[in-house]
Amino acid sequence: MNATIFALLLLLNLAMYNAAEQSSETDMDDTLLIPEINRGRCIEEGKWCPKKAPCCGRLECKGPSPKQKKCTRP
């Protein structure tokens, strides 16, 4: 009796593990890329760039100190 219950629990565990592993695979069509998430909230050239929002396009956040960074061209 105990062996039967143990075998059933083992099979159930394997089935749940396989189902979880298959569902964890992500499809690129279902995921949003970072530029799509931040669309409309990017910082333009010459503006201060805080950590919360990225610079628009190919601009980079550069400056002499962390508090004086601005979005500039690379």
UniProtKB/Swiss-Prot annotation:
Residues 20-39 form a propeptide. GO terms for cellular component: extracellular region. Its main location: secreted. Keywords: Disulfide bond, Ion channel impairing toxin, Knottin, Secreted, Signal, Toxin. Disulfide bonds join C42-C56, C49-C61, C55-C71. It comes from the Eukaryota. Residues 1-19 form the signal peptide. The keyword Secreted applies. The keyword Cell membrane does not apply. One of its GO terms (molecular function) is ion channel regulator activity. Expressed by the venom gland. It is found in: Secreted. The presence of a 'disulfide through disulfide knot' structurally defines this protein as a knottin. Belongs to the neurotoxin 36 family. 01 subfamily. Probable ion channel inhibitor. This is U4-theraphotoxin-Cg1a. It comes from Chilobrachys guangxiensis (Chinese earth tiger tarantula).
